[in-house]
A protein has these predicted regions:
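Structured C-terminal helix/loop/strand segments within mature extracytoplasmic catalytic/sensor domains
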Residues: 2-20, 175, 179, 184-311
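A short, well-structured edge-of-sheet supersecondary motif
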Residues: 12-53, 264-265, 271-274
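Structural recognition of the beta-strand scaffold that forms the well-ordered cores
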Residues: 35-38, 61, 93, 105, ...
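Glycine/charged-rich beta-loop-alpha catalytic/anionic-binding loops adjacent to active sites
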Residues: 45-56, 87, 165-168
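Active-site SXXK
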Residues: 59-81, 94, 274
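Short, well-structured active-site flanking segments
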Residues: 74-93, 103, 197-201
């Protein structure tokens, strides 16, 4: 496990959870339908922080796109796929405004597959093996937090058909799954640790996740800032994020989720990381302001020099 939960962080995390529940439970933030990881670089140079239900296997929505960004750029760097105009645009758009079409284009290029019509027998087996490369890339990194996760399914605006439905299973048993800790591990390795990217490829991966309140599209909900955690941070805060959000998709297993992974630089120059994954119609649809309000609380508490419980 990459994250150490110290005694201080256990106290701070418990106090933070209590305050979040006091402020947001009535607005849909239920302790049994959420996962939270908060962490920073400790004095030892390793990740220290707090996890609440960090191993919760949850439908991740568009959080998988940050993983595909790393995978795709790594293949370009190693010469396994060639950068071209549409790939360059897709890598940008799947993060900038969370385009599912762009993401699925990247998935096709990375795996050498296409979706849609039904397959059977050996043809389906070979197709499935190729798509499993999406999981294999991260499994091969040896991250314990990725065990049991799945990011091999395409991103759909509603229900699946053809080989995509075959692959996900009739009951959705093989839909995408991530945990808060698996997302936290990706963020840690991307900014503080070691991912299979270097030089301009690493800088691009980090840069794509940057969110700027003065960006021309910042007020557009697709930019995933104003209605997510980053929307509660003061203008001018240096931050990086990728959110996930599903309303009704036609399947209960993938409906009404809202997530965010966020890194910001505190006033003293130290970065802090937050992963929040949630399930529920109130958070996902009814009250879009909950996430920015949570972000405002997190910013206030996690920027403090003193532990939260000292308040």
């Amino acid at each position: 496990m990459f994250l150490t939960q110290t005694q201080e962080w256990t106290r701070r995390g418990a106090a933070l959870m209590a305050e979040m529940q006091a402020h947001f439970d009535h607005r849909g933030l239920r302790a049994d339908a959420m996962g939270l990881v908060v962490f920073e670089r400790g004095a030892s140079g390793q990740a220290e922080g707090f996890a609440w239900r960090g191993d919760w296997p949850c439908y991740p929505c568009s959080l998988v796109k940050a993983f595909h960004l790393v995978h795709g750029l790594s293949m370009v760097e190693r010469g396994q796929i060639a950068m071209h105009a549409d790939l360059d645009r897709a890598l940008r758009d799947m993060i900038l405004w969370s385009s599912n079409t762009a993401t699925n284009y990247v998935i096709d290029l990375v795996t050498g597959t296409t979706g849609d019509t039904l397959l059977s027998g050996q043809a389906f087996d070979e197709w499935r093996t190729a798509r499993e490369r999406l999981n294999g890339f991260f499994t091969d990194l040896g991250w314990a937090e990725f065990a049991g996760c799945n990011l091999s399914q395409k991103l759909m605006d509603d229900t699946r058909y053809g080989r995509e439905a075959q692959y996900a299973g009739a009951d959705g048993a093989y839909l995408n799954v991530l945990t808060p800790l698996s997302v936290a591990r990706l963020m840690w390795e991307l900014f503080e640790g070691d991912v299979p990217l270097s030089g301009p490829y690493l800088e691009r991966a980090r840069g794509e996740l940057s969110r700027v309140s003065t960006h021309p599209e910042a007020k557009n909900s697709a930019y995933q800032l104003t209605e997510f955690l980053g929307g509660g941070l003061p203008d001018g805060t240096e931050l990086w994020s990728k959110a996930g959000h599903n309303l009704w998709t036609g399947a209960l297993e993938s409906s009404y989720f809202k997530h965010d992974m966020l890194r910001w630089v505190r006033p003293d120059g130290r970065p802090i990381y937050v992963v929040l994954m949630t399930k529920g119609q109130a958070l996902a649809e009814t009250d879009p302001q909950v996430f920015p309000d949570i972000g405002q609380l997190l910013y206030a508490r996690l920027n403090m020099a003193e532990p939260v419980e000292a308040l």
